[in-house]
């Protein structure tokens, strides 16, 4: 007798998939379908704050890092919620510049995107984030890196004391559900506020804003770009896949899961909300948590979506020899070119 629940979940996925395909039959990726899907994504992300709080940005410190200036600032995203933000400003000329919102993945927080130690010194090894924010500012892009909720200094106080290397994703995700919110939703909301901040800067070309995410930061980037058309170009590194092939196939952080989303969409459907705007997907061929087979499956569906919108030339991808990491061998230059044109 087999008492395990594996078969139950497999069957539930198939039943849900079949029902979803019936509901979207004949209208998949049409204007009506995309509008409905956007609404369902917004619903699955949970409640956003009812009042838009003034950002009130303050520059705390400015340092010269040779190739760029690093501003440490803070702004307010929600009542009683201040966010530490790094801003990398190019040295070539005097603005205005195209800009990028950089969304880091799991790890030490915003400093991973720059490759910095806690004291602000440059680390010897770039790590899996590959100093992507520095690579972008070197290409003449102003880069904003907010500390994402649940990482770095934005963890729960008790968890910072208990384990310096442990995120607060589990605590925040579970408790936010009790308020009709999700951690993914709060992160997307704060990404939208980061776009507000970028557009408020005199040295930013407001019509040329991109977003670059890695791993869980790609989730934030994909959903933010899908909901907010102020984003001109998007890079998703180390995340694009199918839910079935990744977060349903193995253990992943709880911050990846959205209530009821499979009733309406698989992951490529949601990423497809970015179309027809420019999108670049990169993934390591040996990424163990976002398997290559399912990356290829997602890319094929995204190509179909972009083709259907007569925008296939706006979609690019790179499967590089590597693991769960940022490559940037093609995506860095691609994003810079998109935002300059």
Label each PLM-derived region with a short phrase.
Residues 198, 218-229, 335:
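Short glycine-enriched nucleophile-adjacent loop
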Residues 47-95, 99:
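N-terminal cap/lid segment of alpha/beta-hydrolase-fold proteins
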Residues 300-341:
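C-terminal catalytic histidine-bearing segment of alpha/beta-hydrolase fold enzymes
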Residues 1-69:
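N-terminal targeting or regulatory segments adjacent to alpha/beta-hydrolase or S9 domains
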